[in-house]
Amino acid sequence: MSLRAVVLTLFPEMFPGPLGHSIAGKALETGAWSIEAVDIRSFATDRHHTVDDSPFGGGAGMVMRPDVVDAAIAASWPGDGPLVYLTPRGRVLDQALVRELAQAPSLTLLCGRYEGVDQRVLDERGMLEISIGDYVLSGGEAAAQVLLDAVVRLLPGVVGKTESLEDESFERGLLEYPHYTRPAEWRGRTVPEVLTSGHHQKVSDWRQARSEEITQTRRPDLWARYVAARTSLDRGCGQ
């Protein structure tokens, strides 16, 4: 069973874009997932194809109309997966949420523009609001591509080795350890000796230690959650 992705956007020509290349692109070719870009503007009913209007209460910018957006959703939503609105105020996308979304048979993503989308259609449709970070983009298209790339990688058979996924940043609650390849010496910099020792347990221990060190230094928020989870697990095992 493949994932069906539907993207509601004012710029359908932006898709698949980078998703048509590399891992996600190969998965498209093999049928692991599909993508349909729906032009929201085609659901406008006036001769100017108007999709936005000025906000009630005043203020800068324009707001996407609920009637137009809802018509696009009604015509395009497969009905068996979450409706997602990409917005800076949403739940922050993390690996746990990516894993959750990867279990869905379909994902319908609404890409906002201007000042955003009329709140009424978001409430009416019970949309899941997701953010890819604490910054503002010109629209939701780039965010949709980020979300889909993260999700597609977790689909069965898309990434060759399960170990590749398990070792990545965030999968174990830690940032990923450093990687090295040939040549063994480059510009006076050598590969850590333990990695060429052939001792698998020592290599594993080194990688774990580096992951912990990097996480503690660069992402103290992740480190705190990791320590709390590990402490809770240790207590549970001791009961």
Curated annotation (Swiss-Prot):
Record key words, sorted: Cytoplasm, Methyltransferase, S-adenosyl-L-methionine, Transferase, tRNA processing
Q: Which GO terms describe its molecular function?
A: tRNA (guanine(37)-N1)-methyltransferase activity
> What EC number(s) are associated with this protein in UniProt?
2.1.1.228
Q: Name one GO cellular component term.
A: cytosol
Q: Which residues bind S-adenosyl-L-methionine?
A: G112, I132, G133, D134, Y135, V136, L137
Q: Is Isomerase among this UniProt entry's keywords?
A: no
Report the protein name in the record. tRNA (guanine-N(1)-)-methyltransferase
**Protein species of origin:** Rhodospirillum rubrum (strain ATCC 11170 / ATH 1.1.1 / DSM 467 / LMG 4362 / NCIMB 8255 / S1)
